[in-house]
């Protein structure tokens, strides 16, 4: 069985521009919010705080990448990445290293194999 490609074949993912990226947890497991948060504003779980920590570090690791906006949902995250310089970094490398850093700190695999994007 063939896996559907998530990337545009003819597009360079290191081109300057904005990228809307979604990353899901493995098996859609709800890991990032506290389950019994009594308030209307969601409270991040320990795993969710780790995700936020590494989202905030992306810009220091990749100076040509800005995290314009992000939302941490119970079982996935959304972010808008702005690549500000050609050839400085590509979206796949940024996401691979982000996911790896979170996995290493948490000591468990939390991510779905790939990520989804809109260019």
Regions flagged by a language model, labelled:
Residues 1-119:
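Short catalytic/metal-binding and nucleic-acid-binding patches
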